[in-house]
Amino acid sequence: MRESSQVRETTETKIKLSLQLDESTNVSVQTGVGFFDHMLTLFARHGRFGLQIEAEGDVFVDAHHTVEDVGIVLGTCLKESLQNKEGINRYGSAYVPMDESLGFVAIDISGRSYIVFQGELTNPKLGDFDTELTEEFFRAVAHAANITLHARILYGSNTHHKIEALFKAFGRALREAVDKNANINGVNSTKGML
């Protein structure tokens, strides 16, 4: 099974995270940031991943350190669980509607970290979650996993719906990218490595 578990402890946060790429029944997320828990649960459910997160952070300051560090650890687990990347599709993309909003995510498991994030989040806060942290989370995942990630909110009026569409699209796009493909021998690259 392709899986990884990591613990990251700093003076600001303590993150314990396990990711299973090939098992989707065990999802448990507790970060201390309610809206973020909801988004991570949606990501795992729509990507069909197993995901367990226990996080403690300095949320009395704000949620920034917790959100960013969860992204770092998730990206690290993703990178480790993919091992040599043989036989995977490598690329994945998904459009996901959430009522009036439409989100799009495209992923390349390239070994090169890069992110493009486009979208207007008009409501600055949802519960205890600063909406600008959405981009910070995706940036942390992309850099830690060494993937290229494009995340775009095409349109919408409800900030919750916009972010939810992105997290669901992220799950679906990542599922497509990590899935094994019987037609791919070795690594899906003319270089012979990723």
UniProtKB/Swiss-Prot annotation:
Gene3D superfamilies: Imidazole glycerol phosphate dehydratase, domain 1. GO terms for biological process: L-histidine biosynthetic process. Pathway: Amino-acid biosynthesis; L-histidine biosynthesis; L-histidine from 5-phospho-alpha-D-ribose 1-diphosphate: step 6/9. It catalyses: D-erythro-1-(imidazol-4-yl)glycerol 3-phosphate = 3-(imidazol-4-yl)-2-oxopropyl phosphate + H2O. One of its GO terms (cellular component) is cytoplasm. CDD domains: IGPD. The keyword Ribonucleoprotein does not apply. One of its GO terms (molecular function) is imidazoleglycerol-phosphate dehydratase activity. Its EC number is 4.2.1.19. It is an enzyme of class 4 (lyase). It is found in: Cytoplasm. Belongs to the imidazoleglycerol-phosphate dehydratase family. This is Imidazoleglycerol-phosphate dehydratase. It comes from Bacillus mycoides (strain KBAB4).
